[in-house]
Amino acid sequence: MNQITVMGMVLSAMPIGEYDKRIVLLTRERGKIPVFAKGVRRPGSALSGGVMPFSFGEFTIYEGRTSYTMMSASISNYFAELRGDVEGAYYGFYFMEIADYYCREANDEREMLKLLYQSLRAILKERIPNRLIRRIYELKAVCINGEAPQVFGCVVCGDSVRDGQFSAKKGGKVCVECDMDVFDGMRLEVSTWHTLQYIVSSSVEKLYTFTVSEPVLKELEQIVERYMDVYVEKQFKSLEILESIQQ
């Protein structure tokens, strides 16, 4: 067996047998990996604090032929404040579900890990609305996965000057000369186009540095929701709960 140290975040944890847990780690070095934490449910286990969802830090694990086993954890951020905020916690669970959906073992998932970490921090800072954080996260996650919408020019002809509308099914902006067969198009405020362009093109570190007006936020919500419906083939349980508690 090979002992390695990885940096990452616990996406989920589930009991295995009487005393163990199986956790899913999103790591900088190995992508998304399943890790067994043996004896972690015994009273006084030194690993108990390192296997809770949201826990971020360094994990020392053994790499076996078919599985990983956790040996120790040094947690730098538990995001403990989220546990006292029901709505904030479910935003976090939803973000982790999306990360789990997209990420794979042995892939370079550094950008997704960074996005997840910065998004949880943004929820805690409360500088911008959670509704906006959600749409930024969703759209950027899709972009990191290689399915970014075209928002700088027409998806058909490439023109970047003419007015146009956003079509989720077409994959982005369609100009007025090419929109004859667009049936799901939305005409957007100029500020909404600028917001989409900023999210698509900016680094993760600069994502949560702005806010928008309510009309722009509503358009952004509609656009991202439609885009997710087309490109994400999964129903997220945490999102269903989040939307139910917001009603």
Specify the residue positions occupied by each region the protein language model found.
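Non-catalytic alpha-helical scaffolds and adjoining flexible linkers that form interface surfaces
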Residues: M1-Q247
